[in-house]
């Protein structure tokens, strides 16, 4: 799905069928490029958001092609390396715009959101909203409870520099 930094990025997906109803569910998981920096004419580093935006466009295009106007539920999850609110730093609003126009954000639309930040950078005091770079987008379902799995009962304080995110849905 459109790459720059840290080399080629991929997307895995699966088509599922709910036995009880016969309804189709598509699930996509990806990891967008990290800090795709380029240099401007004066040699200053600037962020190139186009690889992330292109990845969002590809995901939406693939989703639309698979659903083809049907009633399938679609989920896109992953470390998208930008937040909806990060403004100029990584320009998440522009990078994620194709997804936001086609789908909903589980973090923003779930009936319950725990308010926790998903990225921690191995820093116990990290609490910037721009750290919400791990996303669940959806279409054709109803988001119930969005949880960032940040408990400290794993035997170590940090299980990763990102906490897993989960959401319960009604199809």
Where in the sequence are the language-model features?
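Active-site regions of metal-assisted phosphoester/phosphodiester hydrolases
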Residues: 1-171
